[in-house]
C-alpha cells in the first residue's frame, strides 16, 4: 500500500480522523474531547449529499484534527454508517492533506483506486475533497474510508 501511495503527489500528513456520533450526542462528545484539552476550531452544518453537523477539534497547535460528525437526516451517509455499526458511532474516515486535490485525484484514478467522487468537490471549511473507497483495490484495501483534503489556507 505504501509503495503505491508514494506515487500520489502531495500527500503531506494526516489532516483529521472523523468520528461518527449519534444524533443528539455531538455536544456531549465535544465536552469529552474538551476535557482532554482539545478546543473546537470550527463548526459547520454541511448540507447537500453529506447532511452532517460537524465540530472540528484541535489539541495544541498541531495540524492533526478530530472531526466529529453528527447526521442531520436518516439519508446521511454518516447515519447509514451508524446503522451499519449496530446503532453505534465510531470511525467514519481518515483524511490526508494534499497540496493539490486535482493532481492527487488524477494519480489515484490512474493507479486504479476506486474513487467515490466523480471529481474533487467542495468540503467543509472551504476545502476541496474527494473520497477513496475502503475496498479500493483487492490486494491493498484500506479497510477504512479515506478522504483527501486540499486546504486553500495552504496556498
Place the predicted regions along the sequence by residue.
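Long, hydrophobic N-terminal alpha-helical segment
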Residues: 1-52
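Acidic-enriched, low-complexity/disordered segments with a strong bias for Aspartate over Glutamate
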Residues: 15, 50, 75, 83, ...
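Residue-level detector of short, conserved catalytic/binding motifs and their immediate flanks
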Residues: 15, 55, 92
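Vicinal oxygen chelate
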Residues: 1-10, 21-36, 40, 45, 53-58, 60, 65-69, 73-135, ...
Amino acid at each position: 500500500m505504501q509503495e503505491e501511495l508514494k506515487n500520489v503527489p502531495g500527500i503531506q500528513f494526516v489532516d483529521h480522523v472523523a468520528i461518527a456520533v449519534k444524533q443528539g450526542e455531538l455536544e456531549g462528545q465535544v465536552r469529552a474531547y474538551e476535557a482532554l484539552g482539545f478546543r473546537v476550531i470550527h463548526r459547520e452544518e454541511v448540507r447537500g449529499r453529506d447532511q452532517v453537523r460537524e465540530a472540528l477539534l484541535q489539541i495544541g497547535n498541531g495540524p492533526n484534527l478530530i472531526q466529529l460528525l453528527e447526521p442531520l437526516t436518516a439519508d446521511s451517509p454518516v447515519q447509514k454508517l451508524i446503522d451499519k455499526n449496530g446503532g453505534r458511532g465510531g470511525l467514519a474516515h481518515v483524511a490526508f492533506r494534499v497540496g493539490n486535490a486535482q493532481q492527487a485525484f488524477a494519480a489515484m484514478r490512474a493507479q486504479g483506486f476506486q474513487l467515490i467522487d466523480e471529481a474533487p468537490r467542495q468540503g467543509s471549511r472551504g476545502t476541496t475533497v474527494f473520497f477513496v473507497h475502503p475496498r479500493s483495490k483487492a490486494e491493498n484495501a484500506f479497510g477504512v474510508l479515506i478522504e483527501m483534503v486540499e486546504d486553500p489556507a495552504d496556498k
